[in-house]
Amino acid sequence: MKQILILGAAALVFAATPAGRVTAPIAVEQMASINVGDMAPDLAFPDPSGKTRKLSDLRGKVVLLDFWAAWCGPCRMENPNVVRVYNQYKDAKFSTGKGFEVFSLSLDNTKDRWIEAIAKDGLVWPNHVSDLKGWRSEGAALYGVNAIPATYLIDGKGKVVAKNLRGAALENALKAMQAK
């Protein structure tokens, strides 16, 4: 009977997991929640060379804050779309700023796999950061990230204007934000 209860509980957890996302082993109540309309909390983490990069240094540009990991299949499948959109909009003029940047916060635990994934997926933007703490990343906790990929679209004034945009939805949001 005990095995049936355990299997039933496992099935419920599996059924509640959104398709195409990898979930965190952290209780949701331990995490913050950043919503559309909130000011984006600042993040400061090392890049692969050890230099600290801050999200706030990109103020004045539209930013996609992208939580991902080298081991996350859905994240890696979305990367070609993010690269395409980055190349298309990096110099665009928006109503709240000029230019589009990606701030990639990796939830990897190992630096080598993280750097290898950046190169293999052709992630050409300069803002790759990680504290290499995996799901225990302070950035993930601050933003309430409990599944990846997770994205926050931030306008040039630092306000979150959309969450979890993927595929064509990201490009459509950027088009709508362009200066008229």
Regions found by a protein language model. Name each.
Residues 77-104:
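Conserved helix-turn-beta segment immediately C-terminal to the redox Cys motif
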Residues 148-180:
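Thiol-/selenol-based redox modules, centered on thioredoxin-like
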Residues 62-63, 100, 149:
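Alpha/beta-hydrolase fold active-site loops
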Residues 1-27, 180:
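Bacterial Sec-dependent N-terminal signal peptides
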Residues 22-56, 173-175, 179:
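N-terminal "domain-start" segment that seeds a small globular fold
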Residues 103, 108-110, 115-152, 156:
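Short, internal strand/loop/helix patches
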Residues 54-76:
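Short active-site neighborhood of thiol/selenol oxidoreductases, capturing the structured segment around
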